[in-house]
Curated annotation (Swiss-Prot):
UniProt domain RNase III: residue ranges: 5-127
Organism from which the protein derives: Alkalilimnicola ehrlichii (strain ATCC BAA-1101 / DSM 17681 / MLHE-1)
GO molecular function list: double-stranded RNA binding; metal ion binding; ribonuclease III activity; rRNA binding
Role according to the record: Digests double-stranded RNA. Involved in the processing of primary rRNA transcript to yield the immediate precursors to the large and small rRNAs (23S and 16S). Processes some mRNAs, and tRNAs when they are encoded in the rRNA operon. Processes pre-crRNA and tracrRNA of type II CRISPR loci if present in the organism.
Name the UniProt record assigns to this protein: Ribonuclease 3
InterPro entries recorded: dsRBD_dom, RNase_III, RNase_III_dom, RNase_III_sf
Keyword Nuclease (UniProt): yes
PANTHER family: RIBONUCLEASE 3, RIBONUCLEASE III
Residue positions binding Mg(2+): E40, D113, E116
Assigned protein family: Belongs to the ribonuclease III family.
Cofactor(s) demanded: Mg(2+)
Pfam families cross-referenced by the UniProt entry: dsrm, Ribonucleas_3_3
Record: active site: D44, E116
Gene designation per UniProt: rnc
Length: 228
């Protein structure tokens, strides 16, 4: 039966010649000794370049702003965490006792950091070409289904444009509830339209994100109403 690290290399499609680099990439800072933060820094730079280069050639007519937003959707922590989960990186991570007990092997930020560290480790182990090939292989499906320019806009902007197109008043956002400790708060926000008895709510760890969720829900309601 393969070890977690062997299985991870199979899923990556890359076999390390220097196993110590793989070990370092999978070592969280909660473990005493060398950790993966420097490799994460390196991998972040490589990832951003590879994705920028690929987008530049895939979208020859896109403006700099569109390319930047496309790249942001691909290299953000959420996407990296999804990739890490798909690779089952958590089973191979080295975590301190406290981090392990608190479920660190499933924490999105830790998975995202480890994926970037793996990109950096592959670059040091095999050079730029293998790191580029690995990144593009892991991003193949996402690159094949890039969002349109309209889809790149955040929900609040899309809702505003939708209402302006119909010459309707802009929405109001109201904080309904703030719960949790000061370092871990949850915001519940309502999005209300002035000319209709329609309200949508969003809930997230920041007011801004909760407003975006509420705007997204409002857009869905307006679209559903339009289709009926």
């Amino acid at each position: 039966m393969p070890t977690p690290k062997d299985a991870l290399q199979d899923r990556l499609g890359y076999r390390f010649r220097r196993p110590e680099l793989l070990d370092e990439a999978l070592t969280h800072r909660s473990v005493t000794g060398p950790d993966n933060e420097r490799l994460e820094f390196l991998g972040d730079g490589i990832l951003n370049f590879v994705i920028a280069d690929e987008l530049y050639h895939r979208r020859p007519d896109a403006t700099e702003g569109v390319l930047s937003r496309l790249r942001a959707t691909l290299v953000n922590g959420r996407t990296l965490a999804e990739i890490g989960k798909g690779l089952d990186v958590g089973t191979a991570l080295r975590l301190g006792g406290g981090e392990m007990k608190s479920g660190g092997q499933r924490r999105k930020s830790i998975l995202a950091d480890a994926v970037e560290a793996l990109f950096g480790a592959i670059y040091l182990d095999g050079g730029f070409d293998p790191s580029r090939e690995t990144i593009l292989r892991l991003y193949r499906d996402r690159l094949a289904s890039l969002p349109t320019e309209a889809e790149l806009k955040d929900p609040k902007t899309r809702l505003q444009e939708h209402l302006q197109a119909g010459r309707r008043p802009l929405p109001r956002y109201e904080v309904l509830e703030v719960s949790g400790q000061s370092h871990d708060q949850t915001f519940r926000v309502a999005c209300r339209l002035q000319d209709a008895a329609v309200t949508a709510e969003g809930e997230a760890g920041s007011r801004r994100k909760a407003e975006q969720q509420a705007a997204e829900q409002m857009l869905k309601r307006l679209e559903d109403k339009h289709e009926r």
